[in-house]
Curated annotation (Swiss-Prot):
Residues 1-23, 60-89 are annotated as: Disordered. This is CMT1A duplicated region transcript 4 protein. Residues 65-74 have a biased composition (Polar residues). It comes from the Eukaryota. Residues 1-11 have a biased composition (Basic and acidic residues). Expressed in fetal skeletal muscle and kidney. The gene is CDRT4. Signal peptide: none annotated.
Amino acid sequence: MDARRMKKEEGLTENTGLPRKLLEKHDPWPAYVTYTSQTVKRLIEKSKTRELECMRALEERPWASRQNKPSSVIQPKRRKSSKSSGKAVFRDTLSESTLSMWGAYSVLAMAPTMIPEPTHLHADSRDCPTENYNKIIFARKPMMRMLPTVRY
């Protein structure tokens, strides 16, 4: 019991036994170094500019004229499936795969009369890359620095 009291008075840590003042001065090294190449940095910059353009285009759309129409008027076009069965089967012409492939922005550009005012779709992370999504960061071991050798 006296040993614990002495450790607390001296400021020693339990795991290493080093004085706390030494641990506070020591700046720990990172476990690994993340290197982001120039190509990846350019890709990140391009995705940020594309996101800004997408947001501007969504804000500039004239949605005010369409807000007065009832929501039942604005519906996606449907067509009958090619399968001939007793039940009528319908498919959306704008399927989920189209949304995931092109994003909401190009769907708006293709058929602006079909979609009502902007709503938060499940594909939000796919239509415009954000800070948290669609980043590619490669970790690479830093180059070893060689000391100059002297040849005689």
